Amino acid sequence: MAKLTKKQKEAQSKIENGKTYTVAEASALIKEVSNANFDASVDLAVRLNVDPRKANQMVRGVVTLPHGTGKDVKVLALVTPDKEEEAKEAGADYVGLDEYLDKIKGGWTDVDVIITMPSVMGKLGPLGRVLGPRGLMPNPKTGTVTMDIAKAVSDVKAGKIDFKVDKHGIVHAGVGKASFDAEKIAGNARELLTTLVKLKPQAAKGVYIKTIYMSSTMSPSVQIDTKRFTEQ
């Protein structure tokens, strides 16, 4: 195991072993222990008591973080010519269709989100092997396949994120940056956790949220009390 640096030891010493924190406490603590020399992302890892191999226990959804992600989200709008102006005015970084489909075929994926229209989805099918593994395939369930292109682009730019439980039953999602006020990190985290509770599958038995950890890039993680995460 790699030896901890002095900074890492200092950070670790601020977190009490075996203690669980409220969201507000964890958010303040993460700001204290985040020692990266860049504006680190703050992430939540939520372990759910579900079996994602079963279709009736899959958890996926979208949430608009009230304080945004802190990230400049690059959006590609794959639209027909009549929708191009709408996409540009809403703030899409790249707008077009066939030229971008060709670029993606060639391996280009330098975007965070792709938004498209139902009539274009047929053209995206063959690109699934490029887009799927990167989480870029548009999906009606996450609002990225729609006729209201302007709203979809605006929502993503304002802090709308989508999430999905992984094969281990964990949802990973960013809830801001270390430069955010602790209150903003906490507000975003609560919004995500509340959304996860609403999405509890009927087939999920027993305790739904098993553990919640908050961390920032290169920082130790802080455990959040699963019974107190709605506290202000």
Curated annotation (Swiss-Prot):
GO terms for cellular component: large ribosomal subunit. Disulfide bonds: none annotated. Pfam families: Ribosomal_L1. Coiled coil: none annotated. Keywords: Repressor, Ribonucleoprotein, Ribosomal protein, RNA-binding, rRNA-binding, Translation regulation, tRNA-binding. Signal peptide: none annotated. GO terms for molecular function: rRNA binding; structural constituent of ribosome; tRNA binding. InterPro entries: Ribosom_uL1_bac-type, Ribosomal_uL1, Ribosomal_uL1-like, Ribosomal_uL1/biogenesis, Ribosomal_uL1_3-a/b-sand, Ribosomal_uL1_CS. GO terms for biological process: regulation of translation; translation. Part of the 50S ribosomal subunit. Binds directly to 23S rRNA. The L1 stalk is quite mobile in the ribosome, and is involved in E site tRNA release. Protein L1 is also a translational repressor protein, it controls the translation of the L11 operon by binding to its mRNA. PANTHER family: 54S RIBOSOMAL PROTEIN L1, MITOCHONDRIAL, LARGE RIBOSOMAL SUBUNIT PROTEIN UL1M. Belongs to the universal ribosomal protein uL1 family. HAMAP family: Ribosomal_uL1_B (MF_01318_B). This is Large ribosomal subunit protein uL1.
